[in-house]
Amino acid sequence: MKDPLNHYDHFLDTLGLRCPEPLMMLRKTARDLTIGQTLLMISDDPSTLSDIPAFCRFMGHHLSAKKADRIPYQYLIVIGCLE
């Protein structure tokens, strides 16, 4: 089975940044993408574990995949698509 985290349109590296910077960078990057594009975000900030899913729900994006068992945390987000 293919790992969905290996297939994405855009990449956002927020390693070393702390709240609220990863979320602010995600918001800015998402604005430049079109509906249906995928964004892989990596972070080492533990606050992203709750912030990213909440952001996706609030902004109407779909958190397609998440790896949070070790750093870097990885989030695959489908822009403007609830599912």
From Swiss-Prot:
NCBIfam families (alphabetical): PRK00299.1
UniProt protein name: Sulfur carrier protein TusA
Pathway the protein takes part in: tRNA modification
Active site: 19
GO biological process: tRNA wobble position uridine thiolation
A single Gene Ontology CC term: cytoplasm
GO molecular function terms listed in the Swiss-Prot or TrEMBL record: sulfur carrier activity
PANTHER family (alphabetical): SULFUR CARRIER PROTEIN TUSA, SULFUR CARRIER PROTEIN YEDF-RELATED
Similarity comment: Belongs to the sulfur carrier protein TusA family.
Self-association state and partner proteins as the record states: Interacts with IscS.
Matches recorded under InterPro entries: Sulphur_carrier_TusA, TusA-like, TusA-like_sf
